[in-house]
Amino acid sequence: HFRVRVMETGSMEGIVPAPLPLDILYEDEDILVLNKPADMPVHPSIGNYTNTLANAAAFYFQQKNELCPFRCINRLDRDTSGALILAKNALSAAILSAQMRNREIRRTYLAVVCGVTPPSGTVSAPIGRVSDSVIQRQVDPEHGESAVTHYERLAVRNDHSLLEIHLETGRTHQIRVHMGYIGHPLPADYLYHPVYD
């Protein structure tokens, strides 16, 4: 038996290490899986230079004397909590990215939505950017990219449904856009359903 170890030569250029708490779900020499809290951006952006998961990961790797560029395999919106997979080297990034592309990594979410949904369903509607917005997305049959969301209702309470959601695709804001599209937006979603009741 042979063992090959991939050594990384780069680091997280441009990402300022910040001593923020990390909830590590799993780690080995190739990957790091983190439990991302809600309200934490993944990448630095305008107004978020040192409070992101990337900053926390940079600090973590710096403390371990590991050179690991920030390679997120999956994406989560700022307000979404859940497992985020980081590849620690180019080989694991290539393998995991191929698995994502081939839909071999299953992404399942829990979400509360307004109203009582059917017991289960599939939303297959292309998603594209709203023309005058950098952030907002919409169902766009003409110019959008393919997007498929499966859901199963787990519970109903106070005219809200708890859903288990499985994504076939990973479009920006896919759950928020698709649930709103079928008339069951996420409550108090500041971008797609800014109604606070």
Residue ranges and their predicted role:
Residues 49-57, 158-197:
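Pseudouridine synthase
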Residues 62, 118-119, 132, 155-160, ...:
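Short, conserved beta-turn/loop elements at beta-strand boundaries and strand-helix junctions
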